[in-house]
Amino acid sequence: MGKKQKNKSEDSTKDDIDLDALAAEIEGAGAAKEQEPQKSKGKKKKEKKKQDFDEDDILKELEELSLEAQGIKADRETVAVKPTENNEEEFTSKDKKKKGQKGKKQSFDDNDSEELEDKDSKSKKTAKPKVEMYSGSDDDDDFNKLPKKAKGKAQKSNKKWDGSEEDEDNSKKIKERSRINSSGESGDESDEFLQSRKGQKKNQKNKPGPNIESGNEDDDASFKIKTVAQKKAEKKERERKKRDEEKAKLRKLKEKEELETGKKDQSKQKESQRKFEEETVKSKVTVDTGVIPASEEKAETPTAAEDDNEGDKKKKDKKKKKGEKEEKEKEKKKGPSKATVKAMQEALAKLKEEEERQKREEEERIKRLEELEAKRKEEERLEQEKRERKKQKEKERKERLKKEGKLLTKSQREARARAEATLKLLQAQGVEVPSKDSLPKKRPIYEDKKRKKIPQQLESKEVSESMELCAAVEVMEQGVPEKEETPPPVEPEEEEDTEDAGLDDWEAMASDEETEKVEGNKVHIEVKENPEEEEEEEEEEEEDEESEEEEEEEGESEGSEGDEEDEKVSDEKDSGKTLDKKPSKEMSSDSEYDSDDDRTKEERAYDKAKRRIEKRRLEHSKNVNTEKLRAPIICVLGHVDTGKTKILDKLRHTHVQDGEAGGITQQIGATNVPLEAINEQTKMIKNFDRENVRIPGMLIIDTPGHESFSNLRNRGSSLCDIAILVVDIMHGLEPQTIESINLLKSKKCPFIVALNKIDRLYDWKKSPDSDVAATLKKQKKNTKDEFEERAKAIIVEFAQQGLNAALFYENKDPRTFVSLVPTSAHTGDGMGSLIYLLVELTQTMLSKRLAHCEELRAQVMEVKALPGMGTTIDVILINGRLKEGDTIIVPGVEGPIVTQIRGLLLPPPMKELRVKNQYEKHKEVEAAQGVKILGKDLEKTLAGLPLLVAYKEDEIPVLKDELIHELKQTLNAIKLEEKGVYVQASTLGSLEALLEFLKTSEVPYAGINIGPVHKKDVMKASVMLEHDPQYAVILAFDVRIERDAQEMADSLGVRIFSAEIIYHLFDAFTKYRQDYKKQKQEEFKHIAVFPCKIKILPQYIFNSRDPIVMGVTVEAGQVKQGTPMCVPSKNFVDIGIVTSIEINHKQVDVAKKGQEVCVKIEPIPGESPKMFGRHFEATDILVSKISRQSIDALKDWFRDEMQKSDWQLIVELKKVFEII
């Protein structure tokens, strides 16, 4: 209390000083005295602030807790908002109360202006925005620091004007602040904001006495001096303020009209949110702190009519009231209860949640608006581009007519005359100028558009520049007709430069096309200069266009007509589609049009054909008929000698296996099984519904089982719809069986297992005319037991491969369990059950896959050379149909081969395609069939890749490109070396098998061919005699060798190995290689020197000279008989050749590293013998004497006998002997 009394006494002294200062200023002589008291007043205020700081902090904390404890919420919202939100409201409320008393009005104006200064924390003249109120404690300091001035006449008017300007600034800045807060403010910032506002209110409440007193003093002073002129000035000021406010409102209205609808909504929502937040905050602050509104303050202030004594009394009363209020506040400061605090916290949490929700909604709405705007802009852009493209295309057409020489202006005629004159001049000089026809026609190259050549880019650039000029002309003509005569100065100069450059080059003069391009560019320049000429030219163009269109209708179907058709199609599609799908359609058409700009005629035709092929494929895929099924393709896989071909022979009633070389299948074969044969084979099956068989037959593919033919097994499995895996019941799963299982797994191909050779079970009684399940029941107990035992063992082996298996008559779920069918190819048991199961599974589970489709799908299986027919290809036709005369594209070794079908040959039903039969010739073949195709240039065809049919000539390049992609992988496998053997086989499949074997044996191959061995093949192989005679060999697999070719090979020294079984060929060739190697080793035995490093054992010197016999330790390498030795430390003295090596009195050929041996070194013939102790000593290391020839001989013929450490020693010795 003592502190407070002291403060009060200081305040009273302060007031006296202020009054004196004001009086001095009014009289006009107190200008100098004014500053000092004001400064002292500022200092005292600071002191007071420091003293009250602790109390203020406590007040803040307690008021935060009692946010919602008071019950009053919405009553005082308007009152609390009005003094802070708008200056307009303040003025209106003032006007109402000021009507009665002018003196009172003046005092209130002064008072209010001072209050505004305190609230907004303004300095003497500079206006600060209201937003500064957000900055908590800094604001309080400013509030206390502000010096108080007495108000003269001029000051009053200025202050009022400043206040209005400041209010406008404040309102704008508050809006900006609210926007920032709504977009990116967190909950914590809003709390800070609330606290700062509360702090300001507290300050206002805590110091009402001094403010009012100072206000009264000013009022008294100003009331005494006020004149009529001042009143008039104030009135004018108010009117001016009103006018400014009206202008500001009009400006805001205009801005709002300019904003788009989306932005309006956004700003409104933000504004409403901001007001709501401010109102809630203000209402809570007023309830908690009890701030006296402006109206109440005005009511409390005394009238201006009273004299100074009355004012003093009032001041004293106010001080008393202030003391009472402080006491009341202390009582309040005791704090709210825990329940109140909890309620307040919950309310705060709810408020935060509400703010976050509003923020999220606002963000979503903004995002939606942005997306809609982007979509609208994209649509506009696409529309614009479409229009531009149409214009551009029209210009292109006119340009083309001009380039063709149908429209010639005066300048063009002159240019042509010049070009003709230069041509004649060149011809007179004897230069041969090639004409267009004489030049060889360039083959069109289809490349990526990124890889364009520079001239093409330049051409397209010129064309685009000319198009831009044209477009500019049109714009000028349409938009600004006055400026038609004045062309832009830069562009024509550039065009003229390009013309001059073109004329300087005599090659450009010689080419008609390039001169026409230059002329075409000229036309566009002249068009701008002469608009009258342009109109005449346009009329001529229209006439020429009509004639051009007629010519195009008659002749050129691939050119502009195709483009027009494409346009029509795209227009129809666009008109039919909905609004949502439009952008994507336009995008795709954009890319087409853009690419048309710089494409050649061939490229346009290419794209047209590509589109046609895609459209046809799409139509075929839609028109799939599930009612009509094609024949399923069934592949037979398994290990060697499991009886694959024998099973098929039993089905076909043929003897193919007996006719094969060694009974081994080495080619892929196909058999067509008709429906009649299926019914015949399955007659013993009782529950087989023969009436409702939907498949027209079956196409069975037989594959080789040998290790080398993995390529053929792979090819066969990739074609088939379902497979038969043949397993020998006596041997179970074997290596190639497991390989086949993995192939089928990778291709996701369903299969059934034939447990073959059940006739080899002891005491088996055959019964081919009954079901195999019934046959098994009839067998003796020991036979049944053996069968069950072996079947279970095989089921376990399948489980090890990750497959569930069960006997077919016990299999309830064929989708998860593989069916095992016991069969015997010899007796015929189980064959009917096998066929029945295949038919059932294909009809039920594979009906979608077997649905009839017109889209051609065919694969080349084998390439064969047949006598009398030339090279033929065996094709499996999976879908669609083939006709005689069709243009086919097949993969070749040197690229795709285009040829025509000269003949379609089919083997008779139930006959093998690969076996020479009396083939039936057909004009048309439907799927699924194994077909032999006769045609031209099929020698270099590659098997295992698709066959394609071109229905129109322009489709050929498209289909070629498709095949090239698939060809790359196959061609990478066949890589020819510079040095190597020559390989020939009857089919590509067996050739691949042979090449695979050579690759694993590390034998290079330099040439391959399919078909019989001719003289030309021997000539090619004989080239190797010069390079490497060991590779002058022809490996002929399953092919005939012509007599003259054999004679030529004998005379040249070329070896021909021929065999019908691939393994025999392997054996013969490996034997030849070994013999050749031995022969060469004998030949190079004396040249090849093996590296060695030996140390002398001095205690074992048996003979020191001629021959030297001593004990040595082999430190590195290997010592062999015949190795020349030398001593590098004694100037490389040669001591002789190792003629004998002994270990424990036993003679050996080689001594390896680490062994201690006795060696006999004899002197080199013709040289004087060297002596131990004279020419070399025990400390010297002996090494073998190597040379470049010896190293080469080791590399070529003794590589197998060398180890890695030996090669390292050679490297070391090379440095010692300085061998390059």
UniProtKB/Swiss-Prot annotation:
Requisite cofactors: a monovalent cation
Q: Where in the cell is it found?
A: Cytoplasm
Q: Where are the annotated segments for G5?
A: 824-826
- Note describing how the cofactor binds: Binds 1 monovalent cation per monomer in the active site. Structural cofactor that stabilizes the GTP-bound 'on' state. May also act as a transition state stabilizer of the hydrolysis reaction.
> Where is the region G1?
638-645
As recorded in UniProt, its EC number(s) are: 3.6.5.3
State what protein this is by name.
Answer: Eukaryotic translation initiation factor 5B
The protein's gene is named: EIF5B
